[in-house]
Curated annotation (Swiss-Prot):
<dbReference type="InterPro" id="IPR039015">
    <property type="entry name" value="ENDOD1"/>
</dbReference>
<comment type="similarity">
    <text>Belongs to the DNA/RNA non-specific endonuclease family.</text>
</comment>
<keyword id="KW-0964">Secreted</keyword>
<keyword id="KW-0732">Signal</keyword>
<keyword id="KW-0399">Innate immunity</keyword>
<comment type="subunit">
    <text>Interacts with RNF26; this interaction is important to modulate innate immune signaling through the cGAS-STING pathway.</text>
</comment>
<comment type="function">
    <text>May act as a DNase and a RNase. Plays a role in the modulation of innate immune signaling through the cGAS-STING pathway by interacting with RNF26.</text>
</comment>
<keyword id="KW-0391">Immunity</keyword>
<protein>
    <recommendedName>
        <fullName>Endonuclease domain-containing 1 protein</fullName>
        <ecNumber>3.1.30.-</ecNumber>
    </recommendedName>
</protein>
<dbReference type="InterPro" id="IPR044925">
    <property type="entry name" value="His-Me_finger_sf"/>
</dbReference>
<dbReference type="GO" id="GO:0005576">
    <property type="term" value="C:extracellular region"/>
</dbReference>
<keyword id="KW-0540">Nuclease</keyword>
<dbReference type="GO" id="GO:0004519">
    <property type="term" value="F:endonuclease activity"/>
</dbReference>
<dbReference type="InterPro" id="IPR020821">
    <property type="entry name" value="ENPP1-3/EXOG-like_nuc-like"/>
</dbReference>
<feature type="modified residue" description="N6-acetyllysine">
    <location>
        <position position="408"/>
    </location>
</feature>
<keyword id="KW-0255">Endonuclease</keyword>
<feature type="signal peptide">
    <location>
        <begin position="1"/>
        <end position="21"/>
    </location>
</feature>
Length: 501
């Protein structure tokens, strides 16, 4: 036995040596190599704080998933996966610890078993949950998303940094929901999971296990399919203190339910290009999963009742011990009456079971109707509030718009008044003499017309006189030339001659 124990411990240490969890420093951005598990390499916005620890979970030299861990609550805020299938529910689970969460100065860069961490890690359990925290409690270790780090179907290895306190029944139902949703609804409608991004998280409550590990109020899952032209996004929540089935919600509604109302996927997983027809098909499968869970819960509630009734009937009608003095006639009557008694009991149980099933069916129908009415009232109230808010915004904006119009009218009036004042000022700035000249201009113009006409006539007369003088001068000059020529020739012409030479 001692040799087998040491061999098992050696195998565990060898397995732990393959599993590495890298804690990112505060000055480092994102999740390092694990950014590929987020849509477009962008982690959710609005969830991380300075108190949280970012972990890139690795195994056998490759990254497996990313985790944002809360040391204050000792549970994860969320974990991110891609194309991951949950582990089998029948596989035995074994959790490992991250030493650097409790001891930042630890030189151990690999997750280890709790037994080995007791002697090698300082302040163990001060900031993270341990297996010992769940002993003698009503809760057990439950994985947010049961994604195994190894491929062993009999022994699944999980980091405790991805676990939260869950009751046994809740853990079984949550893992059953995840297996059904992934295998039947999400992976088949997203290129077999190649472009499927998964986020799972927990919202802490005010209750803790042994005052240490925070019990989640509800757990959630968000899925983003990034297939171009055929993408979709969807969310799911499940309350830990409620017997209701898993609920499907729209991505934006899920973000409103989470603390600080974060954005889980960048641009809401390509919201403008999502395929609504695929989402309808997914919701049909989700409804089937929900109906199956309701049926399973109904059977679980009926099983204890049937067992109790069987015990009660056994107590009420025990088999009577034979008496030595009983007559043969009594035995015959008892033999004949027994089938009728059994038949009556059978009819009674059948009627009781039918009535119980009818009541349960009516309860389910009433609950579904109440949920439908509640949903309708919620959407109606939301629409009414939006309508009233829009009307209120318009009513509030009316005085402002009126003030803007009045301001524009006053501004236009002031501009007109300014123009009039400018015209008056310019008119007053003109000299009086100029105004008199402008006023007397028509009089002077009319009075100058005769003078101008006279001057024109005198000018015309002078022009005619000048023309006559020019003509006579020209003729006289010609005669002088002619006389000069004749004189040189020898003829003498006198003006006193009577016409003879």
């Amino acid at each position: 036995m001692g040799c087998a124990r040491w061999l098992a411990l050696g195998g565990l240490l060898a397995l732990a040596g393959l599993l590495q969890a890298r804690l990112l420093l505060p000055q480092q951005a994102g999740f390092g190599e694990c950014d590929r598990f987020f849509y477009k390499g962008t982690p959710p916005a609005g969830l991380a704080t300075e108190a949280h620890v970012r972990i890139c979970q690795r195994f056998a030299g490759s990254e497996r998933f990313a985790t944002l861990y809360s040391p204050g609550h000792r549970i994860p805020v969320f974990s991110a996966f891609r194309a991951a299938r949950p582990a089998s529910r029948s596989a035995e689970q074994r959790g490992l610890l991250e030493p650097q969460i409790d001891d930042p100065d630890s030189n151990l860069e690999e997750v280890i078993d709790e037994a080995n961490a007791l002697t090698s890690v300082d302040n163990l359990g001060s900031k993270q949950a341990l297996n010992a925290d769940y002993i003698d409690s009503d809760y057990e270790i439950g994985q947010l998303y049961p994604f195994p780090l190894n491929s062993d179907l009999q022994m699944a290895t999980f980091p405790l940094t991805n676990s939260v306190p869950m009751t046994q029944s809740f853990r079984e139902r949550w893992h059953m929901n995840l297996n059904s949703l992934m295998d039947r609804a999400l992976i088949p409608h997203c290129s077999e999971g190649k472009d499927l991004y998964i986020l799972t998280g927990a919202v802490p409550s005010e209750h803790r296990v042994k005052g240490k590990v925070t019990i989640p109020e509800f757990v959630w899952l968000a899925a983003c399919c990034a297939v171009p032209g055929e993408g979709w996004a969807m969310g799911f929540i499940k309350h830990t203190q409620d017997i209701d089935v898993i609920e499907d919600v729209m991505l934006r509604d899920l973000e409103k339910l989470l603390p600080h109302k974060p954005q889980l996927f960048q641009d809401n997983c390509g919201e403008m290009e999502q395929d609504t027809e695929k989402m309808k098909k997914i919701l049909e499968v989700v409804n089937q999963v929900q109906d199956e869970e309701r049926s399973l819960q109904s059977q679980e509630r009926m099983s204890p009742l049937a067992s109790t009734q069987s015990q009660r009937s056994a107590l009420l009608s025990p088999e009577a011990p034979p008496e030595g003095g009983s007559s043969f006639l009594g035995q015959v009557l008892g033999f004949l009456a027994t089938p009728f008694i059994k038949l009556f009991q059978l009819i009674y149980y059948l009627v009781t079971a039918v009535l119980r099933n009818i009541v349960h069916l009516l309860w389910l129908v009433a609950k579904q109707a109440i949920n439908t009415v509640e949903s309708c009232l919620y959407h109606l109230g939301e629409a009414t509030v939006s309508y009233l808010v829009a009307i209120g915004q318009e009513l509030v904006s009316i005085p402002w718009k009126v003030l803007k119009v009045v301001a524009k009218v006053i501004r236009a009036f002031l501009r007109i008044l300014c123009c009039l004042l400018k015209a008056v000022c310019r008119a007053l700035s003109i000299p009086l003499r100029v105004l008199v000249d402008v006023a007397t201009f028509p009089v002077y113009t009319v009075g100058a017309i005769p003078i101008v006409c006279k001057d024109i006539a005198v000018g015309l007369g002078g022009t005619l006189s000048l023309l006559f003088d020019t003509a006579f001068g020209t003729v006289g000059g010609l005669f002088q030339i002619v006389f000069s020529v004749f004189k040189r020739i020898g003829y003498k012409v006198t003006l006193d001659n009577s016409g003879e030479f």
